[in-house]
Regions:
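A short, flexible beta-alpha/helix-coil linker loop
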Residues: 44-45, 97, 149-151
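Short loop/turn elements that form and flank the Walker-type P-loop nucleotide-binding site
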Residues: 5-6, 85-86, 93, 136-138
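Conserved inter-motif catalytic segment of the P-loop NTP-binding fold
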Residues: 48-129
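Conserved P-loop
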Residues: 2, 6, 10-84
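Structural motif
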Residues: 11, 89-91, 142-144
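Residue-level signal for inorganic ion chemistry
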Residues: 24, 59, 91, 146, ...
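Residues at the starts of beta-strands that form the adenosine-phosphate
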Residues: 35-38, 88, 140, 179
């Protein structure tokens, strides 16, 4: 199966530990574009969480040494800026953690802020900006995201809101993408 990113914009979806990140990394590593990849790490750092730090270190160690890592987790606006300024291929991993940071930044977990409309407006600005940056990217971009819609309905409003917002974000990225893949149990399936 040809997995070369001939397309400029690629979205790779999958569940937790589905192999989606490995597939994205392989896709870019095997690309005909030999320029170094910028790896946009959207995960925030959690001081004192040794297991999380170990995960980050493991991911970093398995990427090619020529790749440049840019951590965007502390600032949800940084991913859109990086996509607009890119001068080579970008791997954005992952939109799920990006959305977590964005929702943190706009108090989207707070029921009163959400009900008053402040949080949805502010979140809309952030999601609109990152989606526009992806849609108009001048360089190849491979974006990775979780597909949460296959699971159970979350029991609390904040978790349901997150699932719904991620579903909308994934739909926006899929509409703008040239190629969309779903990875299940390490097996990639081209959707678009």
């Amino acid at each position: 199966m040809d997995t070369q990113p001939a397309a400029r914009r690629v979205l790779i979806l999958g569940g937790a530990r589905s192999g989606k990140s490995s597939f994205a990394e392989r896709m870019l590593a095997e690309s005909a574009d030999t320029r170094p990849v910028t790896y946009a790490a959207t995960a925030p750092r959690y001081p004192g969480d040794a297991e999380w730090a170990e995960r980050i270190a493991k991911h970093r160690a398995q990427r090619p040494s020529a790749w440049r890592t840019v951590e965007t987790g502390a600032d949800p606006g940084a991913l859109a800026e990086l996509l607009r300024a890119a001068d080579g291929p970008v791997l954005a991993d992952c939109l799920t953690l990006w959305l977590t940071s964005a929702m943190d930044a706009v108090d989207a977990w707070d029921e009163a802020a959400w009900a008053a409309g402040r949080a949805p407006r502010r979140l809309g600005v952030l999601t609109g900006s990152v989606l526009a940056a992806f849609a108009h990217a001048r360089e190849p971009v491979v974006a990775v995201s979780n597909e949460l819609g296959f699971g159970l309905v979350p029991p609390d409003p904040g978790s349901r809101r997150f699932r719904d917002e991620l579903g909308r974000l994934n739909q926006g990225f899929a509409a703008a993408a040239d190629d969309v893949w779903l990875v299940v149990a390490g097996l990639p399936l081209r959707l678009k």
